[in-house]
Amino acid sequence: MKKYTQADFDAFEVIDGIKQCPSGDYSDIQIFGERCSFGKWCSFGEWCSFGKGCSFGECCSFGKCCSFGRACSFGRACSFGE
């Protein structure tokens, strides 16, 4: 699984106001803005923060104490705080 840095994340393409984020390991990044769309099997570290309107593919995993803005959506089999 590709591990992304903040610089990688900042460079991702934005289409119709939505940042397109491929599948991968985002555990080194803690703060994500609004309207990000993540692929399947993404992995996030502890204490990460997501703005409103983010969407996550199937089987994404989130560390402890992550926070989510309103209207975020999650694919099936996502796990939280594990």
Question: For each predicted feature, which ranges?
Answer:
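Extended, small-residue-rich solenoid/repeat segments and analogous flexible loops
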Residues: M1-K40
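Thr-biased low-complexity repeat/linker tracts and other Thr-enriched repetitive architectures
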Residues: E34-E82
